[in-house]
Amino acid sequence: MIVGVLALQGGVEEHLTALEALGATTRKVRVPKDLDGLEGIVIPGGESTVLDKLARTFDVVEPLANLIRDGLPVFATCAGLIYLAKHLDNPARGQQTLAVVDVVVRRNAFGAQRESFDTTVDVSFDGATFPGVQASFIRAPIVTAFGPTVEAIAALNGGEVVGVRQGNIIALSFHPEETGDYRIHQAWLDLVRKHAELAI
């Protein structure tokens, strides 16, 4: 089983470290041919506007969006959540997204870099609960609205939705890969394996 990490910018190495620690075979994805044969892909955090521009530069937008629409499992963190969203509350000028997850997302919902913080978050999906996931929020977004096919899987004490699931897509506002808490990576890899088995 090969899983990719979209390696255009951001926290690429941290996700590769997490996935490889869990026994996954990984591949960096920069151009369309890198998508061939993948059974899942991670879209890391970083800067969502830069991610958008580089994805267009490397012509990876349409092939990636098509694979996701066809059911490719995705794990996205922070800017990755923004990049998947159908709508943004506060897009940068000219900013585009893959528009594959039926959510409205607010960028930088907690303020600038100096307002970044670490906390713990309970995450629940597929009948499993992962209590106290160690989470870094770095210029993090929140989900302000979501459609009927989307499930909220994580929220802060104030009610802010910081994790969603839509089908084979898990998207978080925060960075578990930065903290060494790989439980959500493992749960996503389990989802990838189930999807691969169903495809046989």
UniProtKB/Swiss-Prot annotation:
EC number: 4.3.3.6, 3.5.1.2
Residue numbers annotated as active site: C78 (nucleophile), H175 (charge relay system), E177 (charge relay system)
Pfam families: SNO (PF01174)
GO molecular function: glutaminase activity; pyridoxal 5'-phosphate synthase (glutamine hydrolysing) activity
Signal peptide: none
Gene3D superfamilies found in the cross-reference section: 3.40.50.880
Alphabetical list of PROSITE patterns matching this protein: PDXT_SNO_1, PDXT_SNO_2
Keywords: Glutamine amidotransferase, Hydrolase, Lyase, Pyridoxal phosphate
Function of the molecule: Catalyzes the hydrolysis of glutamine to glutamate and ammonia as part of the biosynthesis of pyridoxal 5'-phosphate. The resulting ammonia molecule is channeled to the active site of PdxS.
Subunit record text: In the presence of PdxS, forms a dodecamer of heterodimers. Only shows activity in the heterodimer.
Name of the protein this chain belongs to: Pyridoxal 5'-phosphate synthase subunit PdxT
Biological classification of the source: Bacteria, Bacillati, Actinomycetota, Actinomycetes, Mycobacteriales
